[in-house]
A protein has these predicted regions:
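Active-site-proximal alpha-helix that buttresses catalytic centers in soluble enzyme cores
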Residues: 18-103, 118-124, 128-160
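Bacterial Sec-dependent N-terminal signal peptides
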Residues: 1-20
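A residue-level detector for conformationally permissive "hinge/kink" positions
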Residues: 2-4, 37, 105
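Generic beta-sheet signal
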Residues: 21, 105-113
Length: 160
């Protein structure tokens, strides 16, 4: 009888179909060499990366995505180390958003990108053109997208 009850419960408990996506731009970068296409974080950026770690430490992040640039990888590194996850690299120019959504169903995901890619990423997730490019000096935007079945909610907050 217990075995039947266990089997029944295993098949009757719905799988969590809700997903949460946190999307941020990389922290402040070194700007002394305008021709450097892959700068590292400056001192303020290193501090912001630590602040992001403190923000995300209790969010139960299950996957971390980052572009393959020094500034994004350095932004995510303290978070990655604190929660013990590997970073999954992605390219904004080649991402299939429908596949991204389906492969992260039921997950709590952090995505780190750039001022000119994160707003579009959010727009693709929510299937609407709500957000515009981030000002180049703004590194504090946090976009939150929640998806439960066909219900999608989104929010933009500033985290300093």
């Amino acid at each position: 009888m217990r075995l039947l009850l266990t089997i029944f419960l295993a098949f009757s408990i719905p799988e969590n179909d809700c997903s949460t996506f946190y999307l941020i731009r990389h922290a402040e970068k070194i700007r002394t060499n305008k021709s450097d296409r892959d700068p590292k974080l400056n001192e303020k950026g290193i501090l912001r990366a630590l602040n992001w770690k403190n923000y995300f430490i209790d969010k139960d992040i299950s996957k971390i995505y980052s572009t393959n640039y020094n500034r994004t990888l350095e932004t995510v590194k303290p978070i990655q180390k604190a929660i013990g996850l590997n970073t999954i690299l992605y390219s904004p120019s080649s991402i299939d958003y429908k596949d991204f959504i389906s492969s992260n169903k039921g997950e709590i995901v952090l995505v780190v990108g750039h001022s000119n890619t994160i707003p579009n990423f959010v727009n693709e997730l929510i299937n609407d053109q709500v957000y515009t490019q981030i000002d180049d000096l703004n590194n504090s935007n946090l976009y939150i997208v929640n998806m439960c079945d066909s219900n999608i909610s989104h929010n933009l907050i500033e985290v300093n």
